[in-house]
Amino acid sequence: MSSIAPTDLTDAHWQALHELAMEAMTHAYAPYSRFKVGAAALVDDGRLVSGCNVENAGYGVTLCAECGLVSELIRTGGGRLVAFACVDALGRACAPCGRCRQLLSEHAADDMVLAMPSGMMSIDEVLPDRFTAADVERVVGEESRRAADEQ
């Protein structure tokens, strides 16, 4: 299957993401805040993945919709997220929280596009100077080299 890039996105892609996010939102478990959220993303291989928020009486363990989306991404074969949409119960765009921006970043195509309340934005715009696997490797790789030099 050919790879989809953000430059290939059409209005039809965004409409499909919005509809899937709305459908996912209907499955949200939000008995405490009653703030239901659905998220959907297009994967570089053409798949669509989605998730909904799942609240918990211990608010700190509540799962955002993006958590479910990334779990589905991994469960269905992984890949890179090309486009992302998140909606509330009224169908309005929701911005991912900081934790979810980092979570999405881990699985994002380099030029992933997100539908934000203020318009379309790249992953670098919503999470500038993001922490990536390259940051980990830079430190771990340097520590490995130092350990080897000391032996």
Q: Where does each model-flagged region fall?
A:
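C-terminal binding/interaction regions
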Residues: 2-9, 13-24, 76-151
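Short, well-ordered amphipathic alpha-helical segments that serve as non-catalytic structural scaffolds
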Residues: 20-23, 65-73
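Short Gly/Pro-enriched turn/cap motifs at secondary-structure boundaries
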Residues: 29-32
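Short beta-strand scaffold segments in enzyme catalytic cores
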Residues: 34-43
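Histidine- and/or cysteine-centered catalytic micro-motif in compact active-site loops
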Residues: 42-44, 53-54
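Compact, glycine-rich, soluble single-domain proteins
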Residues: 53-67
